[in-house]
Amino acid sequence: MAISSTDRRSKNVQIFVEKDAVETSFAKWAQPGHFSRTLAKGPKTTTWIWNLHADAHDFDSQTSSLEEVSRKIFSAHFGQLSVIFLWISGMHFHGAYFSNYSAWLTDPVNIKQSSQVVWPIVGQEILNGDVGGNFQGIQTTSGWFQMWRAEGITSEVELYWIAIGGLAMSAIMLFAGWFHYHKAAPKLEWFQNAESMMNHHLAGLLGLGCLSWSGHQIHVALPINKLLDAGVAPQEIPLPHEFLINRELMSQLYPSFSKGLAPFFSGHWGEYSDFLTFKGGLNPVTGGLWLSDIAHHHLALAVLFIFAGHMYRTNWGIGHSMKEILEAHKGPFTGEGHKGLYEILTTSWHAQLAINLAMMGSLSIIVAHHMYAMPPYPYIATDYATQLSLFTHHMWIGGFCVTGGAAHAAIFMVRDYTPANNYNNLLDRVLRHRDSIIAHLNWVCIFLGCHAFGFYIHNDTMRALGRPQDMFSDKAIQLQPIFAQWIQNIHLLAPGTTAPNALATTSYAFGGEVVEVGGKIAMMPIQLGTADFMVHHIHAFTIHVTVLILLKGVLYARSSKLIPDKANLGFRFPCDGPGRGGTCQSSSWDHVFLGLFWMYNSISVVIFHFSWKMQSDVWGTISPDGSISHITGGNFAKGAITINGWLRDFLWSQASQVIQSYGSAASAYGLIFLGAHFIWAFSLMFLFSGRGYWQELIESIVWAHNKLNFAPAIQPRALSITQGRAVGLAHYLLGGIGTTWAFFLARAVSIS
């Protein structure tokens, strides 16, 4: 029988959702631990509450159905988006209702941003410092004001509307999370359709996202910012929609608008170069990247991503197949190459998450560096407190995401990896020579650690002996970072060849002139010397040790010479049972636990380096005669070459603001500094003591309760080894980060 074209088309249409998959039951949700038969019985011991928290989001432990796990993750993503939109709404509401945004717009260099006013209840109104522009409030360092300026927002009313829009989106996302789990739940094959997912994410999310952003920048942000830069008062600038509907108004600012779309369809795209520019450098009025460069950048990205979103094969039989690409990827020394990876990435969400976390973490760290080297928003470069906050924020996020990537890679190895399906592919070959990888990485860590700290110990010793001529320094035995200086020079000179029409360098960090806004330095060439060379090798050391610990946790997740059957013990286990001494702290979870301490070390050194370097060699003022005065007077090169210098000239010297903050608007930072130190010290109680100690203590406390006929119905238990470590780690990181935050903010607010 001949099949008509209509019939053939209908065969392509597949039903990818299941209707009314799971009943909506508030009664079920109200029962703690409803997702687990054991937990649903209720608590018998205090361990129950810990297991409840540990397993609530461990969907693997709740069901063996990959489809059900996929649906739960998908629904949870909508919940996450709902929270994000609610947060964005709250930020804009604060800007609309509690902020000095309008005043800041009139004088962004001298007026500080504030979007929170503390109520006078028991004297906390002391926190409302004078931020300028007849406004008292807490100085914020989030960068929202600069971003709003870049978007073309000129009044608090517009912030109100965005806040309302954010609330609406939050509600829609919440509804979508419920709808796509309970009413129309996608089937497993929908989640596993990698080609369709790539097309939609590339063309839809990234492509159309970039296109809509560049459209907003061209039609709304550019004209408004051009008028603001020219000194027009915000209240005199037309409303955003007028630039959209009034071409005459736009063509006064950008003459090519009068020509409409004719240049586009005739191929004379150069006509649009008045608003799609390739200038390079920074806008001298605002100290930020040229918004017309940013619009051009996003338009180009939109074109690339929309093209990329048509690359993969779906219903039409043309384009790439992800499986074919992966399986064709093999060389003479790589065995089966990438064979089997497609199956891993479509059946293990832990494998997907591991890659995505590693990528997003790396991207966050890249963003941290771009924020100061190429400041994207108007007046953000001269707001030193915000620059320091954003750098620190993105570095911490990057560190946590990369560590999380290793955690989920290890969970994948334990729960989802099937050796038989990966025989002689790249993953299998890496696992087979893991001893060589870890041994070499261990050697690198020892080399870097001994040499990097050796430089400092040498310098501290020579300084103590009064022999400055024998120290490693720019004035004695030089250790110049010649490769870094060479790369800086290449980046400074290359645009002259690769982008001959650009007006300035990509980033003034590489070289060039000093960019100042209102007498404050926005950016200038960052000179590198011996002190940078030395601390760079501390960075290399701490990062390599973090990688060593995390990679060992992944490569030995399933087995090791010590514990051959490790895969059977799971992702987290305290020891390999009684009678096997020396097997504690060998689970993949324990590797993540240890790796997080080293991640904390790594990021701390990076943010300390950044903070001191920028205050010493970049941030400061420039007088009309061109003389530059840096905040700490260029003391990094001399102070950062000894351990004592780091302690005295950075930590102790710059802690004066937080230590002496009492009775001032910065006093909250003094309290946080003390409180966070306490939280950090509290963590040591969990990290340095064993479970038996606490169980014995609990037994005696329970005995006392029994004597008074006051015994609890739920039996108290000491935390397990793993639980104790988790609590200790959480407080260690929270305390450490809180201490650093208070130290940085009290200092930064005083110098900006």
Swiss-Prot record:
SUPFAM superfamilies, per the entry: Photosystem I subunits PsaA/PsaB
Gene3D superfamilies linked: Photosystem I PsaA/PsaB (1.20.1130.10)
Transferase is among the record's keywords: no
Top-rank taxon: Eukaryota
Reactions that this protein is recorded to catalyse: reduced [plastocyanin] + hnu + oxidized [2Fe-2S]-[ferredoxin] = oxidized [plastocyanin] + reduced [2Fe-2S]-[ferredoxin]
Residues annotated to bind [4Fe-4S] cluster: C575, C584
Subunit note: The PsaA/B heterodimer binds the P700 chlorophyll special pair and subsequent electron acceptors. PSI consists of a core antenna complex that captures photons, and an electron transfer chain that converts photonic excitation into a charge separation. The eukaryotic PSI reaction center is composed of at least 11 subunits.
HAMAP family on file: PSI_PsaA
The protein's name in its UniProt record: Photosystem I P700 chlorophyll a apoprotein A1
UniProt gene name: psaA
